[in-house]
């Protein structure tokens, strides 16, 4: 599946491959000491957010690609 922004598709594939490899080779074997794909995800997320803005896709009120606030901030609990 391609990304919302054509310029983001290669980043999406790179992140998907990294995540799937980490999930299968590390996480499922109990090695949970970090996700080596974090920076790839951030770059991909930024690209998608820019593509959405450039295409004027309305996303007001929609949380996507990771929360921007911690759970305690967003639900009002402490």
From Swiss-Prot:
Lineage: Eukaryota, Metazoa, Chordata, Craniata, Vertebrata
Renumbered ranges of motif Cx9C motif 2: 37-47
One of the record's GO cellular component terms: mitochondrion
Protein name from the UniProt record: TP53-regulated inhibitor of apoptosis 1
GO biological process: apoptotic process; negative regulation of intrinsic apoptotic signaling pathway in response to DNA damage by p53 class mediator; phospholipid transport; pronephros development
Motif Cx9C motif 1 positions after renumbering to this chain: 8-18
Entry keyword annotation includes Membrane: no
Entry keyword Disulfide bond: yes
Coiled-coil parts of chain: 1-52
Record-annotated disulphide pairs: 8-47, 18-37
Protein role: Involved in the modulation of the mitochondrial apoptotic pathway by ensuring the accumulation of cardiolipin (CL) in mitochondrial membranes. The triap1:prelid1 complex probably functions as a phosphatidic acid (PA) transporter across the mitochondrion intermembrane space to provide PA for cardiolipin CL synthesis in the inner membrane. Likewise, the triap1:prelid3a complex mediates the transfer of phosphatidic acid (PA) between liposomes (in vitro) and probably functions as a PA transporter across the mitochondrion intermembrane space (in vivo).
Catalytically driven reaction(s): a 1,2-diacyl-sn-glycero-3-phosphate(in) = a 1,2-diacyl-sn-glycero-3-phosphate(out)
Superkingdom per UniProt: Eukaryota
Pfam (any one): UPF0203
Locations listed in the record: Mitochondrion; Mitochondrion intermembrane space
Tissues where this protein is expressed: Expressed in the developing pronephros.
Species whose genome carries this gene: Xenopus tropicalis (Western clawed frog)
């Amino acid at each position: 599946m391609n990304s919302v922004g054509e310029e983001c598709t290669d980043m999406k594939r790179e992140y998907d491959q990294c995540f799937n490899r980490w999930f299968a080779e590390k996480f499922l074997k109990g090695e949970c000491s970090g996700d080596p794909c974090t920076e790839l995800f951030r770059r991909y997320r930024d690209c998608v957010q820019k593509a959405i803005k450039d295409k004027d896709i309305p996303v007001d009120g929609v949380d996507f690609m990771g929360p921007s606030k911690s759970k305690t901030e967003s639900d009002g609990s402490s």
